[in-house]
Amino acid sequence: MTRLHRKHRIALGLGLGLLLGFGGTTVQAAGDAALYEAVAPKGSTFVRLYNASNQEVSANVGSINLEDVSPLSSSGFEYLPAGQYSARVGSQNLPVNLSAEHYYTLVTQSGAAPLLVEEPAFKSKQKALLRVQNLSDKPLTLKTADGKTEVVKSVEPKGRGDREINPVKANLALFDGERKVADLKPISLARGEVVCLYVTGTANQLNPVWVKPPVKE
């Protein structure tokens, strides 16, 4: 092999190295940026919208827009700087004070003023969290569908109850004391996941809905 040919091979090798090495790193970085969401700045607060009404609703808080949330569905959590805001939920306004590193759900119901509900963070990677947000006017207990096992102890009206459990698929129901008042859709829980049961309405007509983070397309 001549010295000239060796130079050509070295140059070709360097060119391929740049293309497959550094170029690959650039492509990978771009892919990672598309795959992972931006990290919230330290001191941010987190808000989502749960729509307990029978029509599509949008909301905005500060710089974030929670748009076109379907009935009995929720948006994902969005972050913004902590502080005091006027939240616009549908056609109504709600003054809110959002603390740093806290999570909140704006709740809209037909014929009622919007509410701000706090959602304490859950950091376990081994367990799942079942949460009951009881916005009804009746104390309620979450049990297995057969009523034999209490899962979340009685939650007072406008109160919250939590229970860490192992990942599982479960058939559960709401009880008023020993009386079953609502069967719930089967629910699957994964490690590190928070699944929240929002109960709206009154004792005469309860509306329990499992609220999970929406699946992204």
Curated annotation (Swiss-Prot):
Pathway: Glycan biosynthesis; alginate biosynthesis. Keywords: Alginate biosynthesis, Periplasm, Signal. One of its GO terms (cellular component) is periplasmic space. InterPro entries: AlgF. GO terms for biological process: alginic acid acetylation; alginic acid biosynthetic process. It is found in: Periplasm. Residues 1-29 form the signal peptide. Transmembrane segments: none annotated. Together with AlgI and AlgJ, forms an inner membrane complex which probably interacts with the alginate polymerization-transport complex and adds acetyl groups at the O-2 and O-3 positions of mannuronate residues. Acetylation of alginate increases cyst resistance to desiccation. Belongs to the AlgF family. This is Alginate biosynthesis protein AlgF.
